[in-house]
Amino acid sequence: MLKVQHWLQREDARNVDLATMAAQAGLGERTFLRRFQQATGMRPTEYCQQLRAAKARELLELTNRSVDQIAWEVGYQDPAAFRKVFNKMVGLSPTDYRRRFDRRNAQQG
């Protein structure tokens, strides 16, 4: 499962589906699902969302890109869906997260 996790991190968890992940692991889809969940405690989709949210947090902290640009960069086709998922996972909207954790100003001071 580590091989798949590292692969997902390199791919930024974008445009991946169950069949592709299972193939990366050399397993059938059902076996992959079971083993992935045992290894990580999450379904593959949840794990991918976590990776994408982590990348989004980094971009919000370190860049001036708009929330929509960040949504597209981390693999969301719909910025509204990104905002909803981000808020659910992080507990703050992307805009509120940026206000609270913006590291660009801290690095300049």
Positions of the model-derived regions?
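Alpha-helical ds-nucleic-acid-binding substructure associated with the helix-hairpin-helix region
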Residues: Q24
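Terminal helix-turn-helix DNA-binding modules in bacterial transcription factors
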Residues: H6, R14-A19, L27, Q37-D78, ...
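Short hydrophobic/aromatic patch on the recognition helix
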Residues: F32, F36, A81-F82, F86
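Key DNA-contact positions within bacterial/archaeal DNA-binding proteins
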Residues: R30, P79-A80, T95
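Nucleic acid-binding interface residues in structured DNA/RNA-binding domains
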Residues: N87, L92-T95
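Surface-exposed beta-strand edges and their flanking turn/coil or helix-capping segments
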Residues: R30-T31, E73, G91
